[in-house]
Structures are given as C-alpha cells and as structure tokens.
C-alpha cells in the first residue's frame, strides 16, 4: 500500500514539474546598439513588454555602435549563434535585403504568427526604406531620425546674436559663425555624422543625386555621383570654416554631441534623436531648426532618414518567431511609439503616433520637436530624395569620412 502511495506521489510531483516546464516563458534575444539615455529608454520598453504578458521574455544586449552591432550579428549568424532580433542601421539595409534566407520578412513573420499588421500605418517616407518594390515590408522601422540644426541660445547671445535669428541658409549660418568667432566663441560650429548630414541628406535636401540608379533603388550597378558644383561648394565651405577655427572637428560619428550638451558648441548639425541626451544634460537654453540649405536652391526638398530597423533573423523555432512577432507588434503600438518619439526625438514612425503626439499638446510645449517630421515630409519625394540603398555602404561611408577629414585639415580639396 505504501508503495502504491509513493508511486502516486511521484507521478503527481512529475506532473507538477511537467506543467511548470510547459508554462515556461519563451525567451528571445535582441541585439542593439544603444547605450546612454537611449539605452535606458530601450530598457524601459523591454521591461514593459515583459511585464505585460506571461508567455515571452525579451533579453536585450548592446553589442557596440551600429557598425559593431551589424558585424556581430553577421558573425553570429555564420556561427549559428545569432539573436532573434537584430538592430540594423539604415546603411546596412541593402546588405540585409540581399542576404535572402538570413531573415524572416516582417510581413511573413506577422502573418505566420497571426499578428495584426498594417504596413500602411507606417509613415511612407520611413517604411519605404525597408519595403520591396512590390510593397512588402521586410523589417520594422524602429528608430528613424533626420538631421536638424541645434542651437545653443546662450552662446548666440554671448556672440551678440539674436538667438531666434534666421538660420535657414548656409550663408546665414556662416554670418553667425563669423560673429561668434569675433566674440571669442571657441567652437562656433560642430557636426556629427559627416557623410550622412553633409553629403547624403545634403543631396536629398537640394534634390540632386548622391548616386546613380535613383540612389540604388532602381538597380545594383550604382555609381556615386556627389560631385556637383553645390556639393563641391559645401564641402569647400566646411573646409574653410575648419581652417579658420569656426568649425571644430570632433569625430566621425556623434562625438560632437558631447561638446554641444556640455555647452561648448554654438551651432551643431546632428540627428533629431540628439534630443534625448540634450534634454537630459543641457544646462542652457537650446533650440531646434531646420537643416540649412543654399539660397540658390528655390526651396529645400526633403531630408531622408537615419537610424535603424529591426530584422527577425531566420533559423529560430516557431514559438520563438511568435514571440518576436508579439514583441514587434508591441513596439508598433501607438502609445509605445508616441512615448518613444517624445522621449527621444526620433520620428513617430506610425501616423497614429504622430497624431497622438500632436493631440497631446507635446509639440506646443516643446517647440521645435515637430520640425524633423515636417522637414522629412514637406514635399513629395523624388528619385533624389527617397533615400539610399547601396551595398557595402558602411565601408563607403568610412572612405568618405576619411576624405572629408583631409579637407578639414587642409591636406585635400573638395
């Protein structure tokens, strides 16, 4: 009798543990490039998702900057140790699109998981970057931004300038830098992301090609073509300012943002997503303006996006893919997108998020935070302003940065 009771007890215990195992959460991995304030805000999103349901757990890991994260993802995929979700900056989009079999397309992932998904709910100027010519979205836009001009109003006053003065053209910016230099301002101008701001977006904003084949959207056999008179004029101007001490070069990426946040730089061209760090750290009054253009241009066209999208990598189980789909659906929710947009300065990538933000009064109480979206969508896109889709673009950018450094230090001409 005791033996029978022991067997029954053992079976009950086994059933209990089997039930616990069956109810264990499915864990997925997300590799990204965010540290600092953006990393904190990303962590908030993950924690909120994990707490919102009891089926899935997302574990996020920073793998370095954008380039390092992409390279880590590629290496891990080859070794069969890759994450479920990989953050890929816009420069890597063409390379991922060409790597068929390495990812599960967004539209297919959501369909297979039974998740409601409306690609038309995304802002077309953003989603077009990650969508095939026949309208199929391959990855989910996550953090999309565009460059703007940041203004340290306190230093403008110190330079004897009206902090609200017109800075819409590069000529007017040059006049402000002259005044700042004359007043002893050590860093009148600085910039982040040189190629992205001063060649890629510069081209789109002036409606001139950066590369042939509609900047890569119309074919693979693409050639770079940023050698127009206005391109040359702008790079020569930057070089001249650098030689005159009006423009201080701080690094190829967003290193100059640290100087601006510390109150050292008067005018800075940087991503709209600089907002998160500037709002948190700046001890001065700052403003946001549209990216300047050359007055010879009748009117600026539109800028293009930077930032990243999230790719669901292949080779994962059906249950893990369901977890990935659930998490991406969560991230695209209006409330999540609106908060991310307001906290970071990244664009609201869904039309509903932008509408909710406007309705909340956020733009009125935070002047300038709507300029990035206006600047990107001010005109119907052209072949020159739709964006860029070039293979090996990260390497191309590295070469461009090296050449621009030569112009800044006076060893090369535009």
Could you tell me what each predicted segment is?
Residues 48-122, 158-165, 259, 264-267, ...:
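Extracytoplasmic "Venus flytrap"/periplasmic binding protein-like
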């Amino acid at each position: 009798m005791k033996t029978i009771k022991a067997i029954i007890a053992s079976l009950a215990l086994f059933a209990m543990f089997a039930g616990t195992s069956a109810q264990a959460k499915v864990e997925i991995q997300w590799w990204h490039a965010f540290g600092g304030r953006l990393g904190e805000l990303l962590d908030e999103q993950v924690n909120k998702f994990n707490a919102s349901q009891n089926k899935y757990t997302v574990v996020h890991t920073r793998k370095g900057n954008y380039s390092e994260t992409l390279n880590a993802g590629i290496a891990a995929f080859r070794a069969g140790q890759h994450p479920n979700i990989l953050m890929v900056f816009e420069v890597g989009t063409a390379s991922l699109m060409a790597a068929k079999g390495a990812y599960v397309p967004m539209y297919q992932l959501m369909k297979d998981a039974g998740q409601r998904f409306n690609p038309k709910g995304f802002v077309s100027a953003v989603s077009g970057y990650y969508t095939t010519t026949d309208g199929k979205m391959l990855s989910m836009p996550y953090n999309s931004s565009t460059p703007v001009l940041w203004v340290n109003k306190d230093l403008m006053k110190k330079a004897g300038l009206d902090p609200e003065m017109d800075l819409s053209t590069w000529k007017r910016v040059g006049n402000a830098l002259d005044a700042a230099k004359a007043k002893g301002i050590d860093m009148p101008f600085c910039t982040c992301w040189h190629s992205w701001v001063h060649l890629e977006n510069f081209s789109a904003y002036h409606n001139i090609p950066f590369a042939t084949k509609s900047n890569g959207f119309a074919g693979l056999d693409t050639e770079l073509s940023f050698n127009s008179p206005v391109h040359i004029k702008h790079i020569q101007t930057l070089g001249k300012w650098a030689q005159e001490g009006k423009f201080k070069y701080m690094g190829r990426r967003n290193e100059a943002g640290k100087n601006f946040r510390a109150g050292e730089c008067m005018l800075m061209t940087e991503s709209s997503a600089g907002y998160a760090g500037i709002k948190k750290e700046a001890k001065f009054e700052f403003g946001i303006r549209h990216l300047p253009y050359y007055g010879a241009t009748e009117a600026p066209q539109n800028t293009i996006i930077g930032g990243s999208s999230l790719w669901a990598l292949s080779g994962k189980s059906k249950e893990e893919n369901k977890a990935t789909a659930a998490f991406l659906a969560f991230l695209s929710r209006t409330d999540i997108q609106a908060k991310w947009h307001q906290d970071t300065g990244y664009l609201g990538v869904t039309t509903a998020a932008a509408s909710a933000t406007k309705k909340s009064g956020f733009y009125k109480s935070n002047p300038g935070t709507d300029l990035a979206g206006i600047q990107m969508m001010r005109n119907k896109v052209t072949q020159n302003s739709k964006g860029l889709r070039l293979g090996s673009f990260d390497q191309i950018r590295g070469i461009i940065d090296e050449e621009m450094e030569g112009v800044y230090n006076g060893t090369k001409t535009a």
